[in-house]
């Protein structure tokens, strides 16, 4: 066997061993909602109409109290009628900036949902909160629909 053949066989064996090695399990923790009651990290809301005299309930923030390598967002539809939910998700940073990681309309069946992510942490930035925005003044069709949301930080 030539040196070149030996190297190819050796590299192939290393690559195969790496592919078959068990993956490091990711450890994730639910993040607490800002303004929550401390008993649950899963928030249930109904999309309300915006109004000029009060704040709509479109935004929900979740505290990030330690460094994580990535983040996940979870959404479940609770309405008995199929609806299209305008969904946005943001990583909010300690320097006041933010990064939009979700921007789509989602039409799940009742009781079903979706996970977005994992979204990696941004080098040189510290995440202070995750923000979920469900519904918007530009799309009033989702008004009245109920949903559950939660977020996780993972290492």
Could you tell me what each predicted segment is?
Residues 83-101:
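Short, surface-exposed beta-strand/strand-loop-strand elements in extracellular ectodomains
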Residues 1-10:
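Bacterial N-terminal signal peptides that target proteins for export
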Residues 19-27:
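Sec/Tat signal peptide C-region and signal peptidase I cleavage site
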């Amino acid at each position: 066997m030539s040196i070149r053949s030996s190297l190819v066989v050796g590299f192939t064996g290393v690559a195969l061993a790496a592919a078959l090695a068990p993956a490091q399990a990711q450890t994730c923790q639910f993040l607490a909602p800002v303004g929550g009651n401390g008993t649950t990290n899963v928030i249930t809301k109904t999309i309300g109409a915006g109004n000029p005299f009060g704040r709509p309930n479109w935004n929900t923030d979740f505290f990030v109290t330690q460094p994580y390598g990535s983040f996940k967002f979870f959404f479940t539809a609770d309405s008995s009628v199929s609806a299209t939910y305008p969904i946005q998700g943001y990583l909010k940073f300690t320097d006041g900036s933010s990064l939009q990681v979700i921007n789509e309309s989602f039409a799940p069946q009742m009781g079903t949902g979706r996970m977005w992510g994992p979204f990696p942490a941004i080098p040189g930035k510290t995440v202070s909160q995750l923000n979920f925005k469900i519904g918007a003044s530009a799309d009033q069709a989702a008004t009245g629909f109920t949903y559950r949301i939660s977020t996780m930080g993972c290492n």
